[in-house]
Amino acid sequence: MGISRDHWHKRRATGGKRKPIRKKRKFELGRPAANTKLGPQRIHTVRTRGGNKKYRALRLDTGNFSWGSECTTRKTRIIDVVYNASNNELVRTKTLVKNAIVTIDATPFRQWYEGHYVLPLGRKRGAKLTEAEEEVLNKKRSKKAEAKYKARQRFAKVEPALEEQFATGRVLACISSRPGQCGREDGYILEGKELEFYMRRIKSKKAK
């Protein structure tokens, strides 16, 4: 039959049936959902009205995520889908849709933070550093550079809930792009009240 976005196949408000006034038209068509899954990248192009293109992501495993309070964006790996307000089935099947809550790899953000502020983030006391990390955090710097980093460090506060996540190496994020339409998986790191809310929801779901 084909998926149609018309309204004349529905009954009237009174409950009476409508007579079809015409056959289905091309401009009323609908397409099946992409149901983007977590996996090695696979994107199909779809020709749309006007000769335009949509990018139908069938599988994705990376995306650009922004850290709002620090005004920085990094490309990182998506690890898992943990919550979806609309449907638990989408969590079970690891389907990536807009507004899904996912866990992402925290490493690119930690590397940026430690390079920008010269402060450790989410590290246990006395944890061994690699040579590269040692060089970033304990490098000998000029007085001018030291003053620059000291000035930055005044604003280097990270909320405790987020710091705990950095210690585990995974951060909760929300997807804000539409992977079935634009073929990308972009979003933002959860912070503040929003992070508290979703952590409560995930906890209550696990308790069931």
UniProtKB/Swiss-Prot annotation:
* GO BP annotation list: translation
Q: Does the keyword Aminoacyl-tRNA synthetase apply?
A: no
Q: Which GO terms describe its cellular component?
A: ribonucleoprotein complex; ribosome
Q: Which GO terms describe its molecular function?
A: structural constituent of ribosome
Q: Report biased composition (Basic residues) as residue ranges.
A: 7-26
Q: Name one Pfam family in it.
A: Ribosomal_S8e
Q: Where is this region: Disordered?
A: 1-33
Instruction: Extract the InterPro entries matched here.
Output: Ribosomal_eS8, Ribosomal_eS8_CS, Ribosomal_protein_eS8_euk, Ribosomal_Se8/biogenesis_NSA2
Keywords attached to this entry:
Ribonucleoprotein, Ribosomal protein
Q: Provide the family line.
A: Belongs to the eukaryotic ribosomal protein eS8 family.
Cited NCBIfam families = eS8 (TIGR00307)
Which protein is depicted?
Answer: Small ribosomal subunit protein eS8
Record the organism. Apis mellifera (Honeybee)
The UniProt gene name for this protein comes to RpS8
